[in-house]
Amino acid sequence: MFGRTYYCGEITEKAIGETVVLKGWVQKRRDLGGLIFIDLRDRTGIVQVVFNPDVSKDALETAESIRSEYVLDITGKVVAREEATVNPNLKTGRIEIQAESVDVLSAAKTPPFAISDQAAEVSEDIRLKHRYLDLRRPEMFNSLKMRHNVTKAVRRFLDDNGFLDIETPVLTKSTPEGARDYLVPSRVHEGEFYALPQSPQIFKQLLMVSGFDRYYQIARCFRDEDLRADRQPEFTQIDIEMSFMSQEDIMKLSEEMMAHVMRETHGIEISLPLPRMSYEDAMNRYGSDKPDTRFGMLLTDVSEAVKDSDFKVFASAVANGGAVKAINVKGAAANYSRKDIDALGEFAANYGAKGLAWLKTEADGLKGPIAKFFAGEKQEALVQALDAADGDLLLFVADKLEVANDALGALRLKLGKELNLIDESLFNFLWVVDWPLLEYDAEEGRYYAAHHPFTMPVREDLKLIETNPQDMKAQAYDLVLNGYELGGGSIRIFEKDVQEKMFGLLGFSEEEAKEQFGFLLEAFDYGAPPHGGIALGLDRLVMLLSGRTNLRDTIAFPKTASASCLMTEAPSEVDNAQLDELHLEIKRKIRQ
């Protein structure tokens, strides 16, 4: 019953004349009066099966009751199609199967949506509710196959380079690493909780202290944070750590791994070494710490050209220590009306901009509401600074440098998509380096780690740790692909006194540091090697390599934007007996 000689999509003309056994699902059924045609589908593709009374009346009789998504066991002979019926859109389009027998292995109800990539758009909620049906679609299968191929390529590369695949705990200690932890109550230890790991960070460092030298793991991680299209509450990262390696060594090995992945999955050779860009340069030129370099429209600082202008918004921004930044949207002046530009201003306001000034370049000079403030040499300076030509649209934000960069960076991406400036066939990798070690929150009056508390400062900057910590640079590096952060890494602190000082900078008391990380600090007392590593988001990498725009399309059973599973209806309530065992009581909010 379960012997199979071919997958449906792999039968070629070489098999003509053979009797084959196939298994699969009914994609489509057509009754032409006397003959019935079925497209039989499995994970490899589709093959046409013909039920002909001259071949088997019993098979034809069974086929009359068959409907879409029935699971069939078919035996038949491979024959060549007549030339007029060849289907060039199918790999198997030059052959068909003359059915000699058919068994219905499983009947099926009419599915809530067509199992086809060409079907009318179906709401994502319906797809997620019936995920087992959605996964039958070829594009979904291909996304998960890409995930398998990427993982396989990563494992092969790391295995060949002397890394050991080591699992780290999933039930661990709650430590502050940025997002909220998912907590797991302990039945045995009343009132105490495990946390699901946000990353294996501390454990992989301890493995280096243990002398394992090269570690990797395809690691499941969990973060209870607000979701968006490229985030999931549970996600997978390619986690790597190495001893006695410099930042250069780790970056070199990481990009060689990515080159191997691209070669194995896409047959593409990427040029090494990958481009590098400083954090400061990325923010100032692209308005983003994960720049999309597939198109231009770079940010330009025009503060010098406008600081003495009569337009007070510009002049005062510069005088108050801010900046005037601009982008030149080449040839777009005619495409954007005043109403359109107002909408762009509203968009920029979402990123903190108080306004969006604009000018259009025409043959006889600059036009627009602020053009009167820029005549003669001032106009020439602005045109020259922005390389403006007839037909260009110039957009300006005058504000604190960070606000101007953020707003114009977001606007640049929006316009790049609207104007089809992005070559979707490109895979533009780059490194962002020279990160600040710390970020200062003026409202709270404290520092936060720009990456995490275990990142080593640049050695030359260690002398600033007690006097000017805000000036310290990190030995950190982020890998970016097409405007998405694939992941980041750093050289780690491996000296106890430096780690203690870092905890102090971040607001930990000595007691808090010992409570949270005492085991790590103690490990450093027993001879810790210099070490570092990187973690790359597998879900996001697969999303980009498979041409998807949503992480959920690269995960077999993902969560929604509200961190729920529509198929299993998780999370769900549990009964009181389970709560009692865990020494828990639900305190419900009173709704007003």
UniProtKB/Swiss-Prot annotation:
CC annotations in GO: cytoplasm
Record key words, sorted: Aminoacyl-tRNA synthetase, ATP-binding, Cytoplasm, Ligase, Nucleotide-binding, Protein biosynthesis
Protein name: Aspartate--tRNA ligase
Region of interest (Aspartate), residue spans: 201-204
GO process terms (BP): aspartyl-tRNA aminoacylation
Sequence positions that bind L-aspartate: E177, R223, H451, R492
Function: Catalyzes the attachment of L-aspartate to tRNA(Asp) in a two-step reaction: L-aspartate is first activated by ATP to form Asp-AMP and then transferred to the acceptor end of tRNA(Asp).
Compartment annotation: Cytoplasm
Organism this protein belongs to: Bacillus licheniformis (strain ATCC 14580 / DSM 13 / JCM 2505 / CCUG 7422 / NBRC 12200 / NCIMB 9375 / NCTC 10341 / NRRL NRS-1264 / Gibson 46)
Gene name for this UniProt entry: aspS
Molecular function terms, GO-annotated: aspartate-tRNA ligase activity; ATP binding; catalytic activity, acting on a protein; nucleic acid binding; transferase activity
Binding site for ATP: R223, D224, E225, Q232, E485, G537, L538, D539, R540
Main location as per UniProt: cytoplasm
Family per similarity comment: Belongs to the class-II aminoacyl-tRNA synthetase family. Type 1 subfamily.
